[in-house]
Structures are given as C-alpha cells and as structure tokens.
From Swiss-Prot:
Pfam families: His_biosynth
CDD domains: HisF
Gene name of the record: hisF
Lineage: Archaea, Methanobacteriati, Methanobacteriota, Methanomada group, Methanococci
Identification of the protein by name: Imidazole glycerol phosphate synthase subunit HisF
GO molecular function, one term: lyase activity
Family to which the UniProt record says this protein belongs: Belongs to the HisA/HisF family.
Subunit structure: Heterodimer of HisH and HisF.
Biological source species: Methanococcus maripaludis (strain C7 / ATCC BAA-1331)
Length: 272
C-alpha cells in the first residue's frame, strides 16, 4: 500500500488565511507563510493554498504569497484559485508551486486540463471538485436518468459539481466529471464535500469512496475533518489517498504529527 498523505489546506483571502463553515462565515486564521512553516515542521506531506476569492471576484493570483512560502518551505505546494489559462499555470509554477489546482476553469474550458497536462505534465494538474449532495424527492424524475444514485443515511442522492467557490451548481454528476478529467489528463482530484465543509463531523465517505472507486486517480479527501478518527475513516472507508484538513490545525486542536501517529496505529502507512 502506498503511503497516505496528510495535507494542511490554507484558504487565502486578501493574503490572510481564513476558515468558514459550508463555504461561508469566514474568520481570520493567520499568516499563510508562518502557518506553512509550522506545518512543514510538524511533518506535513504537502500544502494546498486556495485563493478563495480569486474565481468569484476575479482577483489577481496570489503570486507574492507563493513566492515567500516557497522560499522557506520545501514540501510540495499546490495552488488554486482563479487560474484560467496555461499562462496562469506558468506564472504560479515559476513562483514556486509544484502543482496547480483548477475548478471553475476546468468545468468552463475542459481543454485546459489537456493542454496544461501536455505542457507541464499530468503530475502538475490537480482538478478540484466542490461537490454537494442532491437529495431525490421524486425517483421518477426524467432528469435523473443519467445520474449516479447513491443510498445514504439521509436518503438517496446524486452528487453535483459546483463552481465559483461553491456558489453555482452545474448539473454535472461528480462521478462522470471525475472520469472525464482523468481522461483529459488530470493527475489528481481534490475532492471537497460542500455539505461537510467546516462542520468537523467527518468527511463524506460515500462521496469519497464513490469517486475513489470510479477513477484510478489519487483522491484527496476534503471537507469535514474534526479529529484523527475522521482521517482514519477517509483512508479506510473512503479509500482516499490523502486527507486535507484546515480548522483543526489552524486553531491548534492537534498537530500533523498527532494525526499521523493515530493513522499509523491503525496500520495505515504514513511518512514521518
């Protein structure tokens, strides 16, 4: 079994790290460079920076933050938010990022996935998927014919892809989209459950497992991490390759090392 990864996520707005619940109610969580240094020292396998205002408010990309972080932190850094072109990829990679995450632009212009992977390599292209459960009230609905339906504790649902920072539904089925981005040349999927995001109630294991089982790409589970048990569940039940978390690290509820120790206790390989 490949080593599982623990990845702190830093949502960045106007140069500061913020955290919210269900993609709203944001509060300040610190300086991105300083937090990155802390997580690096704690043993994080990678870092993810998401400029959460970039796609929606058309903000410039956070090149300065990336440069300052890359000068001091030497683990892989993935950067996303408002990246729309191959030139945007190039600028961020030159600033010191190792991978680029795209979401809205991937949905709007899927050929960007193919183009970027051909130029920079598939390992550089991460497709971020913000996904929400769509519960079924009328099973006879004609529009459900092409959807992948899953049974959950709260009822039957399909999983819908959202864009613009979770503000706009696309009608796209998440399973189908995962398969498509794999075929287009994505190297990894960053999978966020909008329902679980910021709740600390655990990852959406039905969603994570569904995507993991329907693509060969590595899956980063995101949204809902509240403790080490949730991370173990993401790996064991969700079949994720990596687990992303924010709140529990930013507010010092635990360290990366704490999480890794608990994961290792469950006979899941991690790197110290």
């Amino acid at each position: 079994m490949l080593t599982k990864r623990i990845i702190p996520c830093l949502d960045i707005k106007e140069g500061r790290v913020v955290k919210g619940t269900n993609f709203v109610e944001l509060r300040d969580a610190g300086d991105p460079v300083e937090l990155s240094k802390i997580y690096n020292e704690q043993g994080a396998d990678e870092l993810v920076f998401l400029d959460i205002t970039a796609s929606f408010e058309k903000r410039d990309i956070i090149i300065d933050v990336v440069k300052r972080t890359a000068e001091q932190v030497f683990i892989p850094l993935t950067v996303g938010g408002g990246i729309k072109t191959v030139d945007d990829f190039r600028k961020i990679l030159r600033a010191g990022a190792d991978k680029i995450s795209i979401n809205t632009s991937a949905v709007k212009t899927p050929e960007l996935i193919k183009e970027a992977s051909e130029i920079f390599g598939t390992q550089c292209v991460v497709v971020a998927m913000d996904v929400k459960r769509n519960y079924i009230t009328n099973p006879q609905n004609e529009n459900l014919k092409d959807k992948n339906i899953f049974e959950t504790k709260l009822g039957s649902c399909w999983f819908e892809v959202y864009i613009y920072g979770g503000r706009e539904g696309t009608g796209i089925d998440a399973i189908d989209w995962a398969k498509k981005v794999e075929n287009l040349g994505a190297g990894e999927i960053l999978l966020t459950s909008m329902d679980a995001d910021g709740t600390k109630d655990g990852y959406d294991l039905v969603l994570t497992r569904a995507i993991s089982e329907n693509t060969k790409l590595p899956i980063i589970a995101s949204g809902g991490c509240g403790n080490s048990d949730h991370v173990v569940d993401a790996f064991k039940d969700g079949k994720a390759d990596a687990a992303l978390m924010a709140s529990i690290l930013h507010y010092r509820e635990c360290t990366v090392n704490d999480l890794k120790k608990e994961v290792e206790k469950n006979n899941i390989p991690v790197r110290f």
